């Protein structure tokens, strides 16, 4: 190939690479990334659909809805791995009112939901966590991981819409008082 041909082809190749990357950049700008499929359990389409769902929920409730799969929990239990992931990736202190991380851990063979902020303090009790996991459990057993995450997200929304559990409170250590949430029930 002559030098003149290489000079013409190099800029053309650079421009074509820019256009090839444009859809990816546009997709990333359309919302936050909430789906992290490290175990490769989801198709690209399933990841996109779940990410859209999580972004809609994040916008509606001002909370994070993080979906995580892993096949290497780095020697940690699923709860610790999920909590570390949530914190290390900036979800804990991003200005939202809390959130949840849903993990399918193929290393420990476990499904877990961990919550933070208002999601934990106000809406999602231990019993409700069990209900959320139960909502997706059969789908996980069947290998229908996207359906499992969707069911768990929907169960979470149902609990948020049900409101605060009657009798739920927090303790303010600074003033030594309990704050009981008015459920209106």
Say what each PLM segment does:
Residues 2, 26-184:
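Folded, non-transmembrane soluble domains that reside on the lumenal/extracytoplasmic side of membranes
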Residues 22-24:
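Transmembrane signal-anchor/signal-peptide helices with a preference for the extracytoplasmic
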Residues 1-12:
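Bacterial N-terminal signal peptides that target proteins for export
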